[in-house]
Amino acid sequence: MYFFIFLKKGQHYLKSWPLESKLGMIFPENRVIKATLFAQKFMPFLAVFAITWQQVYAKSDISALAIAVFSAIVALLIPLQGLYWLGKRSITPLSPQSAVWFYEICERLKQVNETLPILTEQPNYQNLADVLKKAQRKLDKAFWQEL
């Protein structure tokens, strides 16, 4: 049950994290998101290709079929691993240094009259992603150069 919740949270986190090059130097999310998006597009093709290739070149070999099916299953699980990691990451509380940075961005957004949700607990990475997405839309490019 929790596995599917983490996958859903991971998909939401994937969509809400801004893919800015400056953030890629600080957080691993950019690399994980790009790898997950790549895996979502191409791993189903690889899974079908593995089984088709086996059927064309080794029809009567049962062990080759088992290896091809196993390869297909592994290929299909790779995007799920990325989504699971993103889901776990989204609920992880921010480190103290990142929390300070989070509150600084919130203050800048308040200066441009952007409404922010009220946090009753320590901010997590999903909150950071939401704030960064708003900053991407509302703040100028100079903000990203200051990072």
Curated annotation (Swiss-Prot):
Species annotation: Pasteurella multocida (strain Pm70)
UniProt record similarity statement: Belongs to the UPF0208 family.
InterPro entries named in the record: UPF0208
Keyword set, alphabetical order: Cell inner membrane, Cell membrane, Membrane, Transmembrane, Transmembrane helix
HAMAP family in alphabetical order: UPF0208
GO CC annotations, alphabetized: plasma membrane
Membrane topology, record value: Multi-pass membrane protein
NCBIfam families for this protein: PRK01816.1
Cellular localisation: Cell inner membrane
Transmembrane residue ranges: 32-52, 65-85
Classification via Pfam families: DUF412
Name of the protein in its database record: UPF0208 membrane protein PM0703
